[in-house]
């Protein structure tokens, strides 16, 4: 996967794809490759990316052979939306809007697919957002979710990598909380049955509340998703054939629930 202008000028692309750390760069390239592979089925569809960041994923998707007919990137900050709109102004079919615009009635059932990458782990309240996704999706619409693995052996590897990256002055991890030995032990043996440690809540400069990665339990999220959507496929990244219990991120491909019982 090549990263070209104006993609590489995006804020996240600069610190992820173009990171001085080979491990960070490789991991994010592979994460996007897995996601783009899953999103190929959205060819000719209308797609929304909730929490699109700098727009890199949508731009790459629109440049692929199996690209959507139209793609809409959504963010909460006006300056981010303006930056994305300016950098991708020549990309046909790609637009960006503020999150508040999704409340307009014309967006109900307007999308064949909703993508949400590395967002849900930061949400203090996830259920209302899932309800909104269901409202935005048309009949049998698809939901593509990716979240980080912050439990089990991957957590130990990530914490070591974060410390090393911080020591080298690479990347920025605002709001990243440290773990006590007891919290690490609980995180190693976390399950889908209960929240294993208390998650810290931070407040942004704008007054919004959010979680960092500490204590995020992807297994509990999977259970929550399966109560509202039908789970079609689970994939790991950066290595797609790995079990999520040994991976850095996990992808869920789901379908809007029309009465089926999710496995």
Regions found by a protein language model. Give the residues of each.
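Short, intrinsically disordered terminal tails adjacent to the first/last structured region
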Residues: 262-263
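Conserved SAM-binding loop
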Residues: 32-155, 250-259
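S-adenosyl-L-methionine-dependent methyltransferase catalytic module, highlighting the catalytic core
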Residues: 3-30, 79, 100-103, 124-138, ...
């Amino acid at each position: 996967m090549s990263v070209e202008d104006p993609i590489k000028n995006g804020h996240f692309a600069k610190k992820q794809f173009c990171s001085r750390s080979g491990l960070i760069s490789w991991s994010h390239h592979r994460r996007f490759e897995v996601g783009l592979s899953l999103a190929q089925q959205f060819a000719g569809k209308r797609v929304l990316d909730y929490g699109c960041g700098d727009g890199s994923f949508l731009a790459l998707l629109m440049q692929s052979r199996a690209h959507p007919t139209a793609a809409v990137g959504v963010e909460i900050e006006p300056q981010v939306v303006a930056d994305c709109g300016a950098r991708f102004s020549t990309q046909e079919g790609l637009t960006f809007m503020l999150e508040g615009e999704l409340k307009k009635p014309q967006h109900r059932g307007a999308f064949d697919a909703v993508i949400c990458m590395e967002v849900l782990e930061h949400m203090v309240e996830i259920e209302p957002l899932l309800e909104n996704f269901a409202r935005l999706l048309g009949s049998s619409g698809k939901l593509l979710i990716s979240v980080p693995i912050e439990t089990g052996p991957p957590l130990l590897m990530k914490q070591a990598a974060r410390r090393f990256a911080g020591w080298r002055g690479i990347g920025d991890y605002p709001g990243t909380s440290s773990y006590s030995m007891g919290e690490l032990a609980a995180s190693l043996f976390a399950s889908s049955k209960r929240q294993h440690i208390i998650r810290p809540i931070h407040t942004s400069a704008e007054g919004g509340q959010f979680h960092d990665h500490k204590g995020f339990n992807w297994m509990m999220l999977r259970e929550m998703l399966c109560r509202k959507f039908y789970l079609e496929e689970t994939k790991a990244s950066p290595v797609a054939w790995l079990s999520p219990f040994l991976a850095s991120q996990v992808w869920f491909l789901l379908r809007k629930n029309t009465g089926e019982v999710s496995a």
